[in-house]
């Protein structure tokens, strides 16, 4: 499997179609509110908030919605919810390990919706720690290629704690420890390189190879999970060959 696509299927993301756009907007707004509450409402002093706002704008979330979420999170405006981060663990079809990251104001609702989606699509929830040992939290910072070479990016981040620079097609992806994300961002900015995105991700240490039919079952389960407003991200340890990816693209 080629390096640039290896992780593209690790965290399966929804297609931005009209049917799911409303749910995606709600999740982006929620992230802005939480980021503002955690690190303050000034995007220039809160890189996480700045990233969340950029993601929302890229997804065409109205500016008014973005601003209200920022104010709710920072306390400038009343009405913010009491959000909780919860991580569920389990297995999908073919023994695929899954981490389901939720951001919710109702623990019981989140648990019920995750369990229902898993059960109806060939998965099952496990105990805490049942699959998380297979995953490592990783910092990921991405930049647009433009005229940059891989060496340009590597030289900029070498002293900032970067572990790898991967070629992901139109983007370069810099991986690092989650605690080094800000240092890597700062190093890129100092080198005149614009940061596209930065986040903490989960990378699996052991992958499960799947054929196209197996991948379709996992994607169906992931879509069912992400239909819940409480589910923010789903991470799996699937490994898809270039041949399987090509077959899936032709679906």
From Swiss-Prot:
GO cellular component, one term: cytosol
GO biological process: regulation of DNA-templated transcription
Top-level lineage group: Bacteria
Alphabetized SUPFAM superfamilies for the sequence: YebC-like (SSF75625)
Protein localization: Cytoplasm
Keywords of the record: Cytoplasm, DNA-binding, Transcription, Transcription regulation
Span list, region Disordered: 1-22
GO MF entries: DNA binding
Entries under InterPro entries matching the protein: Integrase-like_N, TACO1_YebC-like_2nd/3rd_dom, TACO1_YebC_N, Transcrip_reg_TACO1-like, Transcrip_reg_TACO1-like_dom3, YebC-like
Main location: cytoplasm
Similarity field: Belongs to the TACO1 family.
Xref: HAMAP family: Transcrip_reg_TACO1
Name listed for the protein in its UniProt record: Probable transcriptional regulatory protein Cgl1663/cg1872
Natural source organism: Corynebacterium glutamicum (strain ATCC 13032 / DSM 20300 / JCM 1318 / BCRC 11384 / CCUG 27702 / LMG 3730 / NBRC 12168 / NCIMB 10025 / NRRL B-2784 / 534)
